């Protein structure tokens, strides 16, 4: 969004509300999910109108899920660069300001807000799972390309829920070893729809703290 084009370390600019965050996640990544759904339906397979609408709805939320996870993971770095994607109206409800997120000791106070967005990210990610599970059985390459980010997203959300994201000395990141393991699992699972569903779930994951 244009509001972040002129940021500097002396000033932290935040999104105002939930609508602006949703607009941002759509413009950066939800629109990408929409675009690739268009490409998939134009070149890979045909579906009826109901299935088409389901794919577009879930494809948009697929993209939003990955961007929201990135936002949650990168909060300290973004704040240090003068950008706060956590809506100001949400922070004010808990007597917080963007600059307070530079202090890892404020995590307990920030946790209710943070967990609410982890839950939202899980809900979006469940739509990503729905998108993959809607693919025809012969689309194993497409399944593989989607399973990978879903599993990395699930692992990242688990780590975010268990750690202090405001601690810049200990950044939250899925290890290379785990990514290699996820790659192998994704490759094997993508061969069939049944294996895929067993690995990534059936879009009913619920975040509970």
Q: How would you describe each model-predicted region?
A:
Residues 1-65, 76-209:
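Catalytic cores of Mg2+-dependent Asp-rich isoprenoid enzymes
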Residues 73:
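Active-site flanking residues adjacent to catalytic metal/cofactor-binding acidic residues
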């Amino acid at each position: 969004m244009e509001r972040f084009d002129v940021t500097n370390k002396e000033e932290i600019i935040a999104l105002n509300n939930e609508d602006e965050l949703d607009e941002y996640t759509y413009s950066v990544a939800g629109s990408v999910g929409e675009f690739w759904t268009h490409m998939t339906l134009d070149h890979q397979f045909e579906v009826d109108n109901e299935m088409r609408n389901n794919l577009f709805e879930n494809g948009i939320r697929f993209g939003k899920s990955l961007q929201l996870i990135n936002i949650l993971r990168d909060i300290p770095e973004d704040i240090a660069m003068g950008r706060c994607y956590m809506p100001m109206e949400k922070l004010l409800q808990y007597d917080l300001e963007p600059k307070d997120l530079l202090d890892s000791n404020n995590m307990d106070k920030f946790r209710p807000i943070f967990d609410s967005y982890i839950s939202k990210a899980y809900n979006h990610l469940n739509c990503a799972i729905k998108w993959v599970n809607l693919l025809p059985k012969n689309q194993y390459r497409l399944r593989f390309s989607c399973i990978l980010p879903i599993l990395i997203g699930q692992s990242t959300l688990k780590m975010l829920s268990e750690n202090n994201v405001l601690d810049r000395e200990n950044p939250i990141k899925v290890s290379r070893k785990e990514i290699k393991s996820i790659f192998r699992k994704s490759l094997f699972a993508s061969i069939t729809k049944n294996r895929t569903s067993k690995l990534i779930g059936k879009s009913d994951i619920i975040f509970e703290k």
